[in-house]
């Protein structure tokens, strides 16, 4: 991963100043010398663009991006970093399209009414083929970042039962009913990133938060005791070093931790990388929220996207 790093908190459709919301992706796969990107031809407009489409009622924008990629290219995909928001005017009013980088996982293109041709091209050819300047801008953002070498989805546990009403050891305090529903919603969001492994700090509420995802994907939940609040407070450097080891694992890792850990890790990584957009003294970390952290080959943080806890 090379080029300019970035941080992004544009994670929710709430409050977006647009009449039409859409989502799409720069879909990439490994090529011989550079990534190959998927461009689709739309016969209705006779143009070449990245796969994208409108957000359906009840959908989240990340889900829309993955669904539209599948519908327009036939490819399964896993999301990477957010690239950009594109705004322009259509007959229905102001339109906003949010783009992710997304890795192609395989599939077969079938021509249809919406897209009748799919081409895999290198970034230079993509810049020549794209019909719209705003798509070229998105391409330039992707080229600047490059495909991530690895990602960590750093999740704060969902809402737990009241500490004051719990008689047992705090490590054993479980999720509340609200927290269990948040965990189920998180499973739907996190699955869009195609996790390869799932890990958790030791508290029961952390493990319960990622349990629905583990069940959905058929993966075990690995224990990461150094990344719980108590252990991290005793030796932050050891905890941060362990997190860097996890970030060096290829593919996508999920780690569920706590509010006393996540801001420290994100702030330290962003400061070390000189990442704009993250204030190390004000790192959000609400219960049920996720930081999607993308890393380069040297495990330097390259992009950071904050997703508040899902609401549906």
Q: Predicted regions: what is each one?
A:
Residues 2-50, 152-157:
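N-terminal strand-loop-strand
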Residues 21, 94-100, 151, 289-291:
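Short beta-strand micro-motifs in enzyme catalytic cores
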Residues 27, 41, 99-103, 120, ...:
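Short, well-ordered beta-strand micro-motif
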Residues 33-76, 166-173, 178:
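Conserved Nudix-box catalytic region and its N-terminal flanking loop in Nudix hydrolases
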Residues 43-45, 304-312:
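Short, solvent-exposed aromatic-acidic interface loops
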Residues 53, 58, 64, 148-235, ...:
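Active-site-proximal alpha-helix that buttresses catalytic centers in soluble enzyme cores
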Residues 55-79, 86-138, 143:
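Unchanged
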Residues 240-300:
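Active-site-adjacent alpha-helix immediately C-terminal to a catalytic or transition-state-stabilizing loop
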């Amino acid at each position: 991963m090379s080029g300019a790093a970035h941080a992004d908190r544009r994670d929710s459709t709430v409050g977006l100043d647009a009449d039409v919301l859409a989502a799409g992706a720069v879909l990439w796969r490994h090529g011989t010398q550079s990534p190959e990107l998927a461009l689709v031809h739309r016969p209705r407009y006779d143009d070449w663009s990245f796969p994208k489409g409108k957000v359906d009622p009840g959908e989240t924008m990340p889900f829309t991006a993955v669904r539209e990629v599948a519908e327009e290219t036939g490819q399964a995909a896993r999301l990477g970093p957010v690239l950009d928001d594109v705004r322009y005017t259509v007959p229905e009013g102001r339109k906003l399209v949010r783009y992710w980088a997304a890795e192609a996982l395989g599939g077969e293109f079938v021509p249809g009414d919406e897209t009748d041709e799919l081409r895999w091209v290198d970034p230079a050819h993509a810049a020549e083929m794209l019909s719209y300047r705003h798509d070229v801008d998105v391409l330039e953002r992707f080229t600047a970042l490059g495909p991530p070498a690895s990602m960590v989805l750093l999740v704060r546990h969902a809402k737990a039962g009241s500490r004051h009403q719990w008689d047992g050891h705090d490590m054993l305090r479980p999720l509340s009913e609200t927290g269990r529903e948040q965990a189920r919603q998180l499973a739907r969001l996190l699955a869009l990133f195609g996790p390869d492994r799932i890990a958790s700090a030791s508290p029961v509420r952390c493990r319960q938060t990622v349990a629905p995802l583990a069940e959905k994907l058929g993966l075990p939940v690995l224990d990461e005791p150094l990344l719980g609040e108590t252990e991290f407070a005793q030796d932050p450097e050891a905890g941060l070093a362990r997190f860097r080891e996890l970030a060096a694992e290829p593919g996508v890792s999920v780690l569920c931790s706590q509010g006393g850990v996540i801001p420290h890790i994100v702030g330290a990584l962003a400061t070390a990388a000189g990442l704009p957009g993250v204030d190390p003294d004000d790192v959000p970390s609400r219960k049920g929220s996720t930081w999607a952290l993308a890393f380069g080959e040297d495990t330097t943080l390259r992009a950071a996207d904050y997703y508040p806890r899902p609401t549906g």
